């Protein structure tokens, strides 16, 4: 079963060291509350026009069949599933690239997805009330997500994750 979710976006207003998981995660808590207030599962955050992460997940973008993600930096907490996505892409033959991703590219993406220990891999089908994707697949989990979701479930069943 493929899962879908709605997200909202916000300016990444957290302190300059989002890569440090510390007891003061108030910025992430406030961002998570924003999504809850809007009936969404996550808040996708942007800093100065560039994708950082979501309030409690890493964010990935599919473009022309490849999976793109922002590289680790002081603005991004590398989630426990961050490196797993690269492994799953290799396993199923999806090109994988870490690079800065502009907000406009996220909004124009073929697919957007989240990863975290609790969400596993989750398709984002709406962002700020706008459907993600293009054509007949608009607003639905896409083919890159479907392949990664299946690979994730296989790895989980084999207890390799």
Task: Show where each model-derived region lies.
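Helix-start/capping segments and mature chain N-termini
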Residues: 1-161
